[in-house]
């Protein structure tokens, strides 16, 4: 299971959700879904990480690592 820090990170960076969506090339509705905990495709996750100048693993964290 993935835990998303996307909303917190975007808020901390002072960015508008629509700005991030436009830079990534996704619809605002898709961005809203991701902000509410939806899972992105790998390509979208990579693009978001690039826009935020972060690694994908810093935005979406695997919660079940202890059971692997």
How would you describe each model-predicted region?
Residues 4, 14-15, 40-43:
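Residue-level signal for the short linker/turn that defines the boundary of a DNA-recognition helix
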Residues 8-9, 13, 22, 33, ...:
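Short, charged recognition helix plus adjacent turn
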Residues 19, 30, 58:
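Residues in the helix-turn-helix
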Residues 26-40:
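Recognition helix of helix-turn-helix/homeodomain-like DNA-binding domains
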Residues 37-50:
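Short, basic-rich loop-to-helix N-cap that marks the start of a DNA-contacting helix
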């Amino acid at each position: 299971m993935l835990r998303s820090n996307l909303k917190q990170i975007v808020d901390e960076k002072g960015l508008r959700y629509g700005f991030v969506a436009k830079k990534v090339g996704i619809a605002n509705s898709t961005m809203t879904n991701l902000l509410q905990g939806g899972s992105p495709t790998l390509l979208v996750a990579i693009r978001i990480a690039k826009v935020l100048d972060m690694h994908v693993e810093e935005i979406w964290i695997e919660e079940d690592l202890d059971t692997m």
